[in-house]
């Protein structure tokens, strides 16, 4: 009896142990959340497009709106950032679906097709989809006029089966424009378009500019950026109203990463960091001067190559392309430039400023560039540390133009009106008020042409963006997705201007950068009327 009891107890103990073991196995085999997997891996894998808005390699390492946002998100998660750049949008969604990347961060529209398959994050800016044509050519003002043009092309081809109409309108494969035109085609069966798989939107915009293609579709921000390189591009008509732009994650029951993304964008919106980054990358793109841009593009091809070695030689902690943009704003890269106000030379220095920086001959381009950079360096050093490092340069350039005291007056006025005196987006709106007596009479330094200072800085920013795009339209980035770089979170104290060690050494192997083939009044430039976009 005792043996039987013992056997029963033994079997019960074994059964209990088996249950515990099975439970432990189930607990161990329970899949980890997406966020936990990223933490365990120690790396956030981000897919993005290689362009001058989302991600590119500058003299000081990686840059771009989506890159900087992704870097901040990785820092919040406590992991390193792995950027997986692509030249074509068609590469991104398949990579996300397969699990090769965790997030797409490149400013894509929340189209119905994309939202059905993937989960969009919070909107961080808005764009409209626009039909683009070449200035001086036929401008369709709506879909019906576009169809009439395509039909006329078919008739000229003399073949009912001709694809001539479709060839007049091309869009990129798997772009947000495909579902828009597909839906439009259901309403207008005569509408023809061709989907291109071996090009990106910038390629098609270039083809429109050169006359190889009649029409394409892009978004409003991309068009504004592209016009700085291809000034012949113009808006024909809008296909959509403003649509939200966001990042994308995989759709699944696991919302751990998505929840972190919601929290991240909520935090940076509330702190003002998002507004600061958007001002940095797209706050200057709205104004477009067709005549000025055409002249600038010609100068990029014909004049910049002569002077770029000089800008690179003396730029030091500054991006040489920024110094080039400053010099173009001052003199249009003319070393003998003179103004009735007394400023002269490549950097249009006043005589007192020239003496203060050791320039003996203002018409000597080497002395002028060296002196201009030194003067700018001194102004940057005076800008208050309460201003973000990457925005200090805009305050310094405003001071370069209108004087440091007037710039500080504009900051004080901004604060008095409830704005942020450390945000260029707020201060630039108050600079023009320094012309009005009701405002300048209450300032320390009085009247100033603050509107000119604002335009001066915004012009330099546009020239700078154009030079970036011009010298690195096709950067040498390794497209092999098996060999990708890991970029660690950056020390927030690093100077964006590059006064510290750059990231160039950190970004190696997977990304190769091809070397590119005080009151200082600016020269009064003659303003040419801008023709209407027809």
Curated annotation (Swiss-Prot):
<feature type="region of interest" description="Non-LT domain">
    <location>
        <begin position="25"/>
        <end position="285"/>
    </location>
</feature>
<dbReference type="Pfam" id="PF01464">
    <property type="entry name" value="SLT"/>
</dbReference>
<feature type="signal peptide">
    <location>
        <begin position="1"/>
        <end position="24"/>
    </location>
</feature>
<feature type="region of interest" description="Disordered">
    <location>
        <begin position="507"/>
        <end position="534"/>
    </location>
</feature>
<dbReference type="InterPro" id="IPR023703">
    <property type="entry name" value="MltF"/>
</dbReference>
<keyword id="KW-0472">Membrane</keyword>
<keyword id="KW-0998">Cell outer membrane</keyword>
<dbReference type="InterPro" id="IPR008258">
    <property type="entry name" value="Transglycosylase_SLT_dom_1"/>
</dbReference>
<keyword id="KW-0961">Cell wall biogenesis/degradation</keyword>
<feature type="active site">
    <location>
        <position position="330"/>
    </location>
</feature>
<comment type="similarity">
    <text>In the N-terminal section; belongs to the bacterial solute-binding protein 3 family.</text>
</comment>
<dbReference type="InterPro" id="IPR000189">
    <property type="entry name" value="Transglyc_AS"/>
</dbReference>
<protein>
    <recommendedName>
        <fullName>Membrane-bound lytic murein transglycosylase F</fullName>
        <ecNumber>4.2.2.n1</ecNumber>
    </recommendedName>
</protein>
<comment type="function">
    <text>Murein-degrading enzyme that degrades murein glycan strands and insoluble, high-molecular weight murein sacculi, with the concomitant formation of a 1,6-anhydromuramoyl product. Lytic transglycosylases (LTs) play an integral role in the metabolism of the peptidoglycan (PG) sacculus. Their lytic action creates space within the PG sacculus to allow for its expansion as well as for the insertion of various structures such as secretion systems and flagella.</text>
</comment>
<dbReference type="GO" id="GO:0008933">
    <property type="term" value="F:peptidoglycan lytic transglycosylase activity"/>
</dbReference>
<dbReference type="InterPro" id="IPR001638">
    <property type="entry name" value="Solute-binding_3/MltF_N"/>
</dbReference>
<feature type="compositionally biased region" description="Low complexity">
    <location>
        <begin position="520"/>
        <end position="534"/>
    </location>
</feature>
<feature type="region of interest" description="LT domain">
    <location>
        <begin position="287"/>
        <end position="534"/>
    </location>
</feature>
<dbReference type="GO" id="GO:0016998">
    <property type="term" value="P:cell wall macromolecule catabolic process"/>
</dbReference>
<dbReference type="InterPro" id="IPR023346">
    <property type="entry name" value="Lysozyme-like_dom_sf"/>
</dbReference>
<comment type="similarity">
    <text>In the C-terminal section; belongs to the transglycosylase Slt family.</text>
</comment>
<dbReference type="GO" id="GO:0009279">
    <property type="term" value="C:cell outer membrane"/>
</dbReference>
<dbReference type="Pfam" id="PF00497">
    <property type="entry name" value="SBP_bac_3"/>
</dbReference>
<dbReference type="GO" id="GO:0071555">
    <property type="term" value="P:cell wall organization"/>
</dbReference>
<keyword id="KW-0732">Signal</keyword>
<dbReference type="GO" id="GO:0009253">
    <property type="term" value="P:peptidoglycan catabolic process"/>
</dbReference>
<keyword id="KW-0456">Lyase</keyword>
